[in-house]
UniProtKB/Swiss-Prot annotation:
GO terms for cellular component: cytosol. The lineage of its organism: Bacteria, Pseudomonadati, Pseudomonadota, Gammaproteobacteria, Methylococcales. This is Pyrimidine/purine nucleoside phosphorylase. The keyword Transferase applies. Gene3D superfamilies: Jelly Rolls.
Length: 103
């Protein structure tokens, strides 16, 4: 799916890590939400409250989930799941475009 229809977008950006990760929240009619964003080249650590699925739209990254020693590589078209109350490290060498699905 290349677009979301019939949604509301929060105008204020979510800016993390000094601007290395920037996203916008999209709200759906059923009350669910997603964020659409970019991560600039960096290695970052994110914490999760609710379970998340990260969908890679463009670019690539390496990810290490909390409690794991190995890294997994992901490219455009891939996705990975993060449990709630957990975290992950993400390493990006070129700008990464993503959709974060919550719940």
């Amino acid at each position: 799916m290349s677009q979301f229809d019939n949604v509301s977008v929060i105008k204020q950006a979510n800016v993390y890590f000094g601007g290395k990760c920037i996203s916008h929240t999209v709200q759906f009619p059923d009350g669910s939400r997603k964020t659409l964003g970019v991560i600039l080249p960096s290695t970052l650590h994110f914490e999760t409250g609710a379970p998340e699925v990260m969908e890679i739209v463009a670019g690539g990254c390496r990810v290490q989930l909390a409690g794991q020693t190995g890294w997994q590589s992901y490219q455009a078209g891939d996705s990975f799941s993060i449990p709630g109350n957990s975290g992950f490290q993400i390493e990006v060498s070129d700008t990464l475009h993503y959709v974060c699905h919550f719940g």
